[in-house]
Amino acid sequence: MKTSRRGRALLAVALNLLALLFATTAFLTTHWCQGTQRVPKPGCGQGGRANCPNSGANATANGTAAPAAAAAAATASGNGPPGGALYSWETGDDRFLFRNFHTGIWYSCEEELSGLGEKCRSFIDLAPASEKGVLWLSVVSEVLYILLLVVGFSLMCLELFHSSNVIDGLKLNAFAAVFTVLSGLLGMVAHMMYTQVFQVTVSLGPEDWRPHSWDYGWSFCLAWGSFTCCMAASVTTLNSYTKTVIEFRHKRKVFEQGYREEPTFIDPEAIKYFRERMEKRDGSEEDFHLDCRHERYPARHQPHMADSWPRSSAQEAPELNRQCWVLGHWV
């Protein structure tokens, strides 16, 4: 029983620790959702094709930078269109650049157009005003989720170290199961609220941020993996508590049945005889009392050298034992 309890406690502690590590990592990282954003290509400067996205050898190949350069030269000579407008032959998605981005609970980071480094903005500022309250509620739920995981982990460790005391271990086990279940429910609600806020932000967020395509990232997978480990730890803890209680009750029942002595036959003549002896209150009745005590607790009522009552033989001991029980002389 002790070995199985310890094994279940170790499994619950390991699952709770995994859930805590996954939840903390997901809460602090920015890869809950990731994808690409479509942004317009920067215009070509009048100084040549140095700032054009298709400059160099590729410009001649695809023929897209040459018209832009010609338009820039025409504008500089005064023969171009009024207002200095530049025309491009690019259509469709060719007019845009695609950059990668990844978003977490706290920040949204986007790749620079130059390809060097990232630019991060607060995701709370990007969320629509109607969703900021839900987002803050999600943040608070995530914090409570991690705190309750810490409390449950601490209680499980205490229960593991106090496994020798069954009663105290059961109390700690019950509280650890309750805190772990509550943390799992809070974590599930927090993850779902953040997902809802992100989907609304994709539709109603700033124009320069809205994703062209997106999917869930590894932080999102860690968050739900943490929830899975948390619920597995709570189920293991509840299972350990239930099995320990059942085993404890079963052993107690066996113990009580093994030590319960019920007489199978009562001799009326023996009852009458011993009642008469009790009424006389003579010295022989006292010897009978001592014989009964000696039969019940032989180590506690050892005779002294001066004692002279007759000891019961091996054949007489069961009968004397039964008669003493009948008359209620057990002490």
From Swiss-Prot:
This is Germ cell-specific gene 1-like protein. The keyword Iron does not apply. InterPro entries: GSG-1, PMP-22/EMP/MP20-like. Component of the inner core of AMPAR complex. AMPAR complex consists of an inner core made of 4 pore-forming GluA/GRIA proteins (GRIA1, GRIA2, GRIA3 and GRIA4) and 4 major auxiliary subunits arranged in a twofold symmetry. One of the two pairs of distinct binding sites is occupied either by CNIH2, CNIH3 or CACNG2, CACNG3. The other harbors CACNG2, CACNG3, CACNG4, CACNG8 or GSG1L. This inner core of AMPAR complex is complemented by outer core constituents binding directly to the GluA/GRIA proteins at sites distinct from the interaction sites of the inner core constituents. It comes from Homo sapiens. Coiled coil: none annotated. Residues 30-132, 195-217 are extracellular. It is found in: Cell membrane; Synapse. As a component of the inner core of AMPAR complex, modifies AMPA receptor (AMPAR) gating. Residues 1-8, 154-173, 239-331 are cytoplasmic.
